From Swiss-Prot:
Its EC number is 1.14.19.81. This is Sarpagan bridge enzyme 1. Keywords: Alkaloid metabolism, Endoplasmic reticulum, Heme, Iron, Membrane, Metal-binding, Monooxygenase, Oxidoreductase, Signal-anchor, Transmembrane, Transmembrane helix. Highly expressed in roots. Expressed at low levels in leaves, stems and flowers. The lineage of its organism: Eukaryota, Viridiplantae, Streptophyta, Embryophyta, Tracheophyta. It comes from Rauvolfia serpentina (Serpentine wood). Its main location: endoplasmic reticulum.
Length: 503
């Protein structure tokens, strides 16, 4: 009987890891709590296939504690499941866990892990994050985008009104708004290639599950080839790269003369980045390449579309299931806006209850239930135990956000829990860190949440909503689908009716 090439490789891999298992030296150091493991594949891998990893890991943490070690393939992972331990890791030991693992998806889709999300910790990342904070996504810059946001909101509201009385998929409407807003803010116009970029964003998200088998056995270099992941990502990158190259090349021709002198002021993010490419940035010593720019523009679009749409979709889902919350939020928006034609950025500060709705929604439905993993740069001690270099640190934020030791009625949807509370999601309150904390906190929180609040306020102001087919609120399913983030398994479909108050 013939044995296939794939089977031969699999058998050789098993023999190799059995040998490593038998010959590795025994540690005399105090060990972190861990569950019993299977040979070679280690812990939980078999449990996570086709499941929701954040829920599997929370169940294990309930048994083994908030700091838990898992051996998954070759990967040594430390899973953190409480606010106080997350604070200890990300604050006390922040520099030591400031690296990112170099995953297969990041290496290919982000031009060898360029950009702020997956770049190795060092001078490049520090400089890039400074540009994000002071130029690309500063509060002043975000305010300058309000006009763009309001313009695109008006277009979206008109589109929804045209379908009033008919079931619509809310996610599709939001994605069009977010893509067009991101493109105008990033590159100055609604660029060609919308469908390619949206398709690439969805594909990248679907392929970016927090833990992929290709990354669990890094010594088996052929694994991404056997699985087909490398081919899928390479083909996807080719399509994406064509669109990004055209956008950047066209803009650069308009910005610079033949002798490299700027012809126009930078009015958007791409303009700022091109100044740095051509040595005309605020720090003339810091230069970036076309690949840097493509990675940055792509991560801005990727992070600013799908995650924001998912947050609003969960907000609307929870309000449909909780009509009391829906009415209270609508009453606030309609009272604040009164007879205005549309929601504006300047209105958001007055929408206190809407902000509570967003906080409560990201607590229960975070855009990334497992925060992007960190990689340990040097051994360090925690709780009398050694956290080894090269381990992954995974913050199970979903476990933190539903921890009954921190939250009263932890699984109940209750925005009022944030009334008269100073807790926010900007990285200082570790019970609410859906966007991360410490040296790798998401640099685009303000931009993203501004879009989320504008979308939500527009839906609440202009429309009343109901489920199709006479479905009752309590019948709406809340099933999750796990990828780079956690979205609804079944997209939210609602029937809008035009509100007299909002029109």
């Amino acid at each position: 009987m013939e044995i296939s090439v794939t089977t031969s490789i699999a058998l050789a891999t098993i023999v190799f890891f059995l040998y490593k298992l038998a010959t590795r030296p025994k540690s005399t150091k105090k060990q972190l709590p861990e569950a019993s493991r299977l040979p070679i594949i280690g812990h939980t891998l078999h449990q996570m296939v086709g499941s929701l990893p954040h829920r599997v890991l929370k169940n294990l943490a309930d048994q083994y504690g908030p700091v838990m070690h898992l051996q998954i393939g070759e990967l040594s992972a430390i899973v953190i499941s409480s606010a106080d331990k997350a604070k200890e890791v990300l604050n006390t030991h922040g520099v030591l866990v400031a690296d990112r693992p170099q995953t297969t998806v990041a290496k290919i889709m982000l031009y060898n892990s360029l950009g702020a999300t997956f770049a190795p910790y060092g001078d490049y990342l520090k400089q890039l994050r400074q540009i994000y904070a002071l130029e690309l996504l500063s509060p002043k810059t975000v305010r300058s985008f309000w006009t763009i946001m309001e313009d695109e909101l008006s277009t979206m509201v008109t589109s929804v009104k045209a379908e009033a009385g008919q079931p619509i998929v809310l996610h599709d409407k939001m994605l069009t708004y977010l893509y067009d807003t991101l493109c105008r803010a990033t590159v100055g116009s609604v660029c060609n290639g919308r469908e390619t970029l949206i398709m690439a964003a969805r594909e990248t998200s679907a392929l970016s599950a927090a833990i992929r088998i290709e990354d669990l056995f890094p010594s088996v270099k052929i694994l991404p080839v056997i699985s087909g992941l490398k081919t899928r990502l390479t083909n996807l990158l080719k399509q994406l790269d064509t669109v990004l190259e055209d956008i950047i090349g066209e803009r650069e021709k308009k910005m610079f003369s033949s002798n490299n002198q700027p012809l126009t002021e930078e009015e958007d993010m791409l303009g700022v980045l091109l100044m740095y490419k051509n040595g005309k940035g605020k720090d003339a010593k810091f230069r970036i390449t076309n690949n840097d720019i493509k990675a940055i523009v792509w991560e801005l679009i990727l992070a600013g579309t799908l995650s924001s749409a998912a947050i609003v979709e969960w907000c609307m889902s929870e309000m449909i299931k909780n009509p009391r919350v829906m009415k209270k939020a609508q009453d606030e928006v309609r009272q604040v806006l009164k007879d205005k034609k549309t929601v504006s950025g300047s209105d958001l500060a007055k929408l206190e209850y809407v902000k509570m709705v967003v906080k409560e929604s990201v607590r229960l439905h975070p855009p990334a239930p497992l925060l992007f993993p960190r990689e340990v740069r040097e051994d360090f001690e925690m709780d009398g135990m050694i956290i080894p270099k090269k381990s992954w640190v995974i913050i199970n934020y979903w476990a933190v956000g539903t921890d009954p030791k921190t939250w009263h009625d932890a699984v109940k949807y209750e925005p009022e829990r944030f009334s008269n509370s100073s807790v926010d999601f900007y990285g200082s309150h570790f019970e609410l860190i859906p966007f991360g904390a410490g040296r790798r906190i998401c640099p685009g929180i303000l931009f993203g949440t501004t879009n989320v609040e504008l979308l939500l306020a527009s839906f609440l102001y202009h429309f009343d909503w109901k489920l199709p087919g006479g479905m009752k609120p309590e019948e709406l399913d809340m099933n999750e689908l796990f990828g780079a983030g956690c979205v609804r398994e079944n997209p939210l479909c609602l029937i809008p009716s035009i509100s007299v108050a909002g029109n």
